[in-house]
Amino acid sequence: MGVTGILQLPRDRFKRTSFFLWVIILFQRTFSIPLGVIHNSTLQVNDVDKLVCRDKLSSTNQLRSVGLNLEGNGVATDVPSATKRWGFRSGVPPKVVNYEAGEWAENCYNLEIKKPDGSECLPAAPDGIRGFPRCRYVHKVSGTGPCAGDFAFHKEGAFFLYDRLASTVIYRGTTFAEGVVAFLILPQAKKDFFSSHPLREPVNATEDPSSGYYSTTIRYQATGFGTNETEYLFEVDNLTYVQLESRFTPQFLLQLNETIYTSGKRSNTTGKLIWKVNPEIDTTIGEWAFWETKKTSLEKFAVKSCLSQLYQTEPKTSVVRVRRELLPTQGPTQQLKTTKSWLQKIPLQWFKCTVKEGKLQCRI
């Protein structure tokens, strides 16, 4: 996984851990949980010894749970790549935990998969589980597959993040982002640390600019979902499709969709029309603001906790998230009043592109 933590608790150590560590490990035995302290609006790794081993953690009110999206670590987010990280399995009960705050996601997913006999592959979402509330692009995949198992799990042990709830399984027709859940340790209990309240409008009703962000749904058709021979089609309309490739970015697909409409390339019969993109066409168009906001730096650091000698003997490589400062002439998209923390909205800016002589020409 992309997130490397600083503390691991093997199964045979469970009975000897304190209540604090037991709370941390609730999330999953195999996880490495990053621990940190908020100082001056940044997430910094701090000496766990100062808080735990010297009894400075006075109550669980000093813990704040956050959802961290995998895409911030640079994992491939295109549909063919992302779906390979998920797999069906039986005999393992699903688990759900809550988290208090999260990031804005660039890519989310929504699955409606059926078996060849027409039965559903994925369970319906339990009461109270709603879709991830902040997605720039929602990749909605419909189709069929063998679905050899009761539930779809994450092969790398990550969670599927929903609206302030994280589950180990995928629910039918419910938008999710891939991620992990981690605790932040505050120097002292702060009631107003996360002061902003999430908006409650559904993801598909955000075209009003006053809502503060845009969400676009991109639709796909899948056959053989969950197998090595899965085929994906990008849906332009119910009769016009494009063969999907991993190199296609969401921005390229939207540009391609507009090009097919404006150039009259849609199916004009009752039959299905499937296009294939010329391999020479540049598909690397993307939103620079997203990756600027998600910049990460790799640093070496050693755990100095009194527990470190039990569980870790050498420094680990960890991902430290750094918030990008806007230039004085720049401003973020309209947003709700919030604390000055590293959990911020993604300033959305995008390219405008035209197709001339078979080549994409883009400008900001």
Curated annotation (Swiss-Prot):
Family annotation (InterPro entries): GPC_FiloV, GPC_filovir-type_extra_dom
Glycosylation sites: N40, N204, N228, N238, N257, N268
GO BP, one annotated term: monoatomic ion transmembrane transport
Site (Cleavage): residue numbering on this chain: R324, E325
Cystine pairings recorded for this chain: C108-C135, C121-C147
One Pfam family in the UniProt entry: Filo_glycop
Keywords: Cleavage on pair of basic residues, Disulfide bond, Glycoprotein, Ion channel, Ion transport, Secreted, Signal, Transport, Viral ion channel
GO MF terms, alphabetically ordered: channel activity
One of the record's GO cellular component terms: extracellular region
Signal peptide feature range: 1-32
Claim: GTP-binding is one of the keywords in the record: no
Taxonomy, superkingdom: Viruses
Recorded family membership: Belongs to the filoviruses glycoprotein family.
Protein name per Swiss-Prot or TrEMBL: Pre-small/secreted glycoprotein
Organism: Zaire ebolavirus (strain Eckron-76) (ZEBOV)
